[in-house]
């Protein structure tokens, strides 16, 4: 059963432009100082139903929506991968069928290198696929001692150890490329 914590239908804080943000339910990182502790429990939140999905599609299809952000919880936790993949697939379908300009953002406590390197203990093909389908990921666990409330170091990240990776440029250049926004 797929679970989510909440949907922000009009969001300007979790990525560039106006977007929709879906907070998945469940995270095993439990970062000290996390702003979203209510999303830690994999059994908490709400069930992702056909009715919720229909509402989500309508929210994402609005002409002024330029971004989908998936965060949590941990979108790349094994338990959350089915929902994360479903959200990315819906967004991709909307982009293709509506010829919509929309960017896909994903927040994760994993690092980009851990996700895409098959030698990493955190590697899984389904986790890597979710990242490959995204335009940008904000990677790394939140670290309270590196908290940046002004976004003076990394815009859209909670702590200075986190990075915004331009996934498609990274794939193209075969190296980690940071977002230049």
Predicted regions and their residues:
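Short, charged beta->alpha transition segments
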Residues: 53-61
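Short, flexible, glycine/charge-rich loop motifs used to bind or transfer phosphoryl groups or to couple energy/partner
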Residues: 11, 58-59, 125-128, 154
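Short cysteine-rich clusters marking metal-coordination/redox-active sites
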Residues: 31
């Amino acid at each position: 059963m797929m679970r989510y914590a909440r949907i922000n239908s009009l969001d300007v804080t979790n990525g560039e432009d106006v977007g929709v943000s879906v907070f998945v339910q469940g995270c095993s990182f439990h970062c000290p100082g996390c702003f979203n502790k209510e999303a830690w429990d994999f059994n908490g939140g709400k069930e992702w139903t056909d009715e919720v999905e229909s509402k989500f599609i309508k929210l994402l299809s609005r002409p002024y929506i330029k971004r989908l952000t998936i965060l949590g919880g941990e979108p790349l936790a094994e338990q959350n991968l089915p929902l994360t993949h479903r959200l990315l697939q819906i967004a991709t379908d909307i982009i293709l069928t509506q010829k919509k300009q929309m960017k896909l953002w994903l927040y994760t406590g994993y690092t980009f290198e851990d996700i895409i390197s098959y030698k990493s203990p955190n590697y899984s093909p389904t986790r890597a696929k979710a990242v490959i389908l995204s335009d940008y990921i904000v990677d790394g666990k939140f670290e309270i001692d590196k908290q940046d409330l002004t976004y003076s170091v990394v815009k859209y990240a909670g702590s200075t150890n986190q990075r915004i990776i331009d996934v498609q440029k990274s794939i193209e250049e075969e190296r980690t490329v940071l977002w230049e926004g």
